[in-house]
Amino acid sequence: IAGKCWPAFQTQFGFVPCYVNSRLTAQGIPVSCEVDIYGALSEFIGTVVSQDVVTLLDINNSVPADLYEEDIKGKYGTYTLKDTFMGFHCGNTAACKLTAHEMKYQKIMARSLPIEVTNGTLEGDIVPGDITFFRLQSTADAQIRAYIAHGEVLPVATRSFGAIGIFAIPEMGRFYRHVLIEGNYPHHGAVAFGHFGKTLYEVFKYIGVPVEEIGYNQPAGVRYPTENPFA
């Protein structure tokens, strides 16, 4: 299901559908946010591959530098600040994938709307552990492409709202620039709980994604085709 939760739903029905969406996803019926059709398809693929609940998150939120310095640096391997990001959505992640959960209201929408019509989010920090961050997408001329990256959700409190977690992916900064931005990917990424890159790679090949269009997070020292070798 790819529903128009933002910004139209709450003004028509008097509540936000985040919690309902999370319940459907928990039952194996993936629901994407903001009419993200390829996001819903990516979630479905992840559900089948992982045989588990998945989620869909915004990937364009950074981890505050002070939080990184206090709670992450030197405590979880060699992750740099650029390797981390806040995976966030209003409240669509299933309760079984949250460390604790609570029904709340959509704080961003409530800045301009009555709180009573923004009720319906399911909020909490996402469970720590291994994840696969991935997406299938089409270009404007109907050419399909995809990306896959292994990483983890860190066991660090986000101190924020929504369904949210602190994600760490090796060389995420370079991956973000040379795959996500250069590939014109939207700001939503699907998340499977575990490492499923090997299977996802074969699935993407099977459905016709050219191997050169399957992006992944290159290890340090392995250059992206457009990466400046002198940088």
Question: Language-model segments: what does each one mean?
Answer:
Residues 2-15, 69-70:
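Hard-cation-handling environments
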Residues 2-3, 55-58, 214-215:
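General beta-strand structural signal in soluble alpha/beta enzymes
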Residues 9, 46-53, 204-211:
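Structural signal for hydrophobic packing residues in well-ordered secondary-structure cores
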Residues 13-31:
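A short, gly/pro- and small-residue-rich
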Residues 16, 20, 45, 200-203:
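Generic structural signal of hydrophobic/aromatic residues within well-ordered alpha-helices
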Residues 19-23, 74-78, 209-214:
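Short, low-complexity, polar/charged sequence segments that are solvent-exposed and flexible
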Residues 25-161:
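C-terminal catalytic subdomain
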Residues 106-231:
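Extended hydrophobic packing segments that form well-structured cores
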